[in-house]
Amino acid sequence: MTNGRWLLAFAIFLLIGLAFRVYVAHWLPNDTPDDGRVYAQMARNVLEQHVYSHDPEAPFNPSLIRLPGYPLFLASIYSVVGHTNNGAVRFVQALIDTASCALIAVLAFYWQPDEKKKRVTALAALALAAVCPFTTIYTATILTEVLTNFLLVALLLSATFALGKFTTEDTEKTRKQQWTRSLAWWCVAGLVGGIAVMMRPDAGLFLAAVGLTLVIGSLWPLVSGLRKKTAEDQGSKTKDPRPKARRIITRVIASGAAMSLVFILVLAPWTIRNWRVFHLFQPLAPQHAEMPGEFVPRGYLLWVRSWLDDQKYVSQFLWPLEVEPIDVDELPDSAFDSPEEKKRVAALLEKYNKPDDSENSDTDGASVEPTARPTPTPSASPASQSTKSNPTASPAPDENNDEEGESEETDQEQSGVEMTPDIDAGFMQIARERIARHPFRYYVWLPIKRARTMWFDTHSQYWPFEGELLPLDDLDYDIHQQYWLPLFAGLTAIYTLLGLAGAWVLWRARKFEARQWLLLAVLAIGLRLVLFSSLENPEPRYVVEFFPILCVLGGIAIARIAVSTRSDSDGVRE
């Protein structure tokens, strides 16, 4: 393929991706996620009240429930086009997501181990990214996914340049220059990783994947080489390998230190601000997006985590907490290990559903103080603030069953429910007993099932036809779920299979660099999947960041398939 034809094809695919995203952003805007309203309120408060707060009205108390990256991004756009112009935000996000497609193509170009297939790989990866509906839909929302995907690909590309410079065989004449360039790229990786974490705290897992790749990818060849040389040269006089080993180890430490230092500098202003305002060392955001002193029902969350294995239960037993009553009869059988345990859970839920009755019958319950909460906002409902368990402090859930504009007090007055510390302690005791009885189930089997439900989903969230494919009898024919959901499930399978095929191509290349990229991809996906499968809210949107990586690997696989098909065709003609 000539340069002109390749550039033309690249431009066409990029325009297709842009048109798709602009169309979705304009015609399918989605303002339902509560997180979006929280971010928008914070951005407006920064511009209008000059304070970082999630309160919709005075006194606009300072807040730390969300990291400042995305609200400041919104504020920068609002300051130009108006404080409520989310249409402009969506258009900018469409441009950024299109830029992500271009970066995906560049990353695939560098990861392809075969020089003759690099251009085809880039075009294939670009095509996969351009038409990917799973990432495109987030251009229509006021959420962090678009920027996170862009920064993820930029981080992987920076690490690719740094690792490539670091692992390339060089001469004495160019060694210092290449090392300087490599160190610069590690600083860029730290900067991009820090900004990504300011958008979504769990993005730090991608930086961890880069760091592990640096250590493993740099030291493994050294260890293997030393073992091989020891086996071959026993009894013979050979050059001492220790100076080279020391040089490599020194460079690994220096590279990691440079990346970490820049990363810490990015987080420093937010950390200092939280220390000065709240007297807390809080470099990210609180684990459950709670304000200082706010009660979090950790016992109930642990109990849910001891049995929940499917995302369909999240909307039934997590988001309604402190908003709606919870019926013990709706719980699955897996939530109980015995009839006695079910009775204990039923008694606790009875207290939760009817707090007034429990206060009259339980003297201990009468002494429980009301749950401390930050100033309520329509977009920071109790469901979204108190039920999310996330050790990386990712934003609270986007979905719940609250009506817009209702405050937390109004919800509690209407529902008459309350999760008290006493009730929560009861759930904590049951959860610990369940974990002690079946540690394998809790630590291994349930995370595997949650990982499955996150990955093998239709990933139709925020599309007009969103829903679950199974059971088929529950499909909504009015919004054509019978067509769209099977299509999206099929696309998920296609992207997954292409990703696996691309990983196989990298492994089979038997080149150090190719396997290094495979290690980076596996760690970037694996660390995140392990974390979120260990939580009690396995939402499929938490794996949307995997699709850019699958596009890169898929491009590598398509290039291999295309070349093999062409070779077979030429052989038949001959």
What does each model-found stretch correspond to?
Residues P68-L72, V80-A102, L123, Y138, ...:
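Loop-to-helix entry region of an early transmembrane alpha helix in multi-pass inner-membrane enzymes
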